[in-house]
Amino acid sequence: MSEHRADIYYGNLYRREQDSTDVYPDKLTDRVCYGNVPCHQACFYKAELLKKETPFDLSYKIRADYEHFLRCVYRDGARTIHMPFTVSDYEGGGFSEDEINRKRSAYEHRLITKKYLGNKVYRYRLLMILTLQPSRELLAGSRTFSGLYHKLKAFIYRISGR
């Protein structure tokens, strides 16, 4: 049973506003961690990870949870396990979703990914541009297309073994 123990368990997230489910990959690669990790509403941390030092770096006003996840995985070697079912029902409309905070979030994302992924970030930024990331973001946020988009993404994760 010990091979199934993790420091962080994460499941899928139902987005009520879009009426769709974010299906996260089984394996969190550098590329996945650059794009975005499972949101904090879908994560369950071993208590020790939250008791170490200060769990959240509050200099990150929007992305403290993202930085904490990457710190646990990259610096502390936390093991993760994906639970292939929905664990959170997210209503939407959170603090990070208004225009000013979205800009701050993008800025903090650049700082955090550079800190943990180093120069790999340039490759991943280029990949996001080439794969039309802004268009994918619009599809994912659309009530009309979100369900289809997330089903396709889950299928790609499944066939690619991620």
Where are these regions (language model features)?
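Conserved nucleotide-sugar donor-binding catalytic segment
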Residues: 11, 15-108
